[in-house]
């Protein structure tokens, strides 16, 4: 009898899943994340804020059991903006994401991280 594979996570259709659509140089893909991470709004926000997921274009929330899907990009961008500390500098990509999806008002007072290059 063949050995059965252990399952690390179990898919549940009746929860909200968060798919992160990324785009870079006209190539689009959905970020590959653990199933447990995909059903957590908090982990989705954390992954975007930390840079774990880059080139974020959209965040789609869907529940297969309820046949619902929503573009929650603006909601996620607003949640991120509210967590940013004005005394810290913010990665350019993250600041652009918030500005594009939440609006300019949410980026006022935030500082962009400036990249420094050293001649060598």
What residue ranges belong to the model's regions?
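Residues that form generic nucleotide/phosphate-binding pockets
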Residues: 47-48, 79, 97
